[in-house]
Amino acid sequence: MKFAVLKFPGSNCDRDMYNAALKSDVEAEYVDYRNTSLDGFDGVLIPGGFSFGDYLRSGAMASVAPITEAVKQFAKEGKPVLGVCNGFQILTEIGLLPGALLHNDSHLFVSRNESLRVVNHNTAFTNLYNEDETVVYPVAHGEGHYYCTQDMYDRLEANNQIILKYVNNPNGSFNDIAGIINEQGNVCGMMPHPERAIEPILGTDSGVKLFQAMVNSWREQNV
């Protein structure tokens, strides 16, 4: 398996994503935002940071970068896509995931470890966790408040698209939502950082299982 790690001007978690992929015993390669093809890749990782300085709003300018059309096609083909933090914001901006990310209720940047509850463990991203398992991922964002209408939330619930919820909501996200998937189950977005949770020496290795689940799920279908 080979992951594409996208790089935009202002990305700052691309190395963490790259290392998380390598730790899962697969290949990874950085892909510049000006590229227009994802040929040769089996998965896409969209890292956190402040793409294009977060001008207009987080992820807005990245959403019209050349690489995003390739990401849409990649997702349409059923291949796995993970967007974390700014990557989640980009996925909502390009319409691969529902909802939007707003400023934190506190209007402050939040940076700390957060406990999360695994709401749905029957996905390609969470199937190595137990249902209702508590995991710990770092968060680092100023615009992490996940917003959706009640109707959208009801659809997310009905389709089991909510995969992670905050134990102690740090940003005002609707019904504590921390991470979701698309209806097809191959696109995942979350504000917390699993790629920063892969080394026990840094306080938590809860994120290892998420990347390994992605790899295992791909291998089950393709090897």
Swiss-Prot record:
Signal peptide: none annotated. Its main location: cytoplasm. The active site is at C85 (nucleophile), H193, E195. GO terms for molecular function: ATP binding; glutaminase activity; phosphoribosylformylglycinamidine synthase activity. Its EC number is 6.3.5.3, 3.5.1.2. Residues 2-223 form the Glutamine amidotransferase type-1 domain. InterPro entries: Class_I_gatase-like, PRibForGlyAmidine_synth_PurQ. Keywords: ATP-binding, Cytoplasm, Glutamine amidotransferase, Hydrolase, Ligase, Nucleotide-binding, Purine biosynthesis. It is found in: Cytoplasm. It catalyses: N(2)-formyl-N(1)-(5-phospho-beta-D-ribosyl)glycinamide + L-glutamine + ATP + H2O = 2-formamido-N(1)-(5-O-phospho-beta-D-ribosyl)acetamidine + L-glutamate + ADP + phosphate + H(+); L-glutamine + H2O = L-glutamate + NH4(+). Pathway: Purine metabolism; IMP biosynthesis via de novo pathway; 5-amino-1-(5-phospho-D-ribosyl)imidazole from N(2)-formyl-N(1)-(5-phospho-D-ribosyl)glycinamide: step 1/2. Pfam families: GATase_5. One of its GO terms (cellular component) is cytoplasm. One of its GO terms (biological process) is 'de novo' IMP biosynthetic process. Part of the FGAM synthase complex composed of 1 PurL, 1 PurQ and 2 PurS subunits. Part of the phosphoribosylformylglycinamidine synthase complex involved in the purines biosynthetic pathway. Catalyzes the ATP-dependent conversion of formylglycinamide ribonucleotide (FGAR) and glutamine to yield formylglycinamidine ribonucleotide (FGAM) and glutamate. The FGAM synthase complex is composed of three subunits. PurQ produces an ammonia molecule by converting glutamine to glutamate. PurL transfers the ammonia molecule to FGAR to form FGAM in an ATP-dependent manner. This is Phosphoribosylformylglycinamidine synthase subunit PurQ. It comes from Staphylococcus saprophyticus subsp. saprophyticus (strain ATCC 15305 / DSM 20229 / NCIMB 8711 / NCTC 7292 / S-41). The gene is purQ.
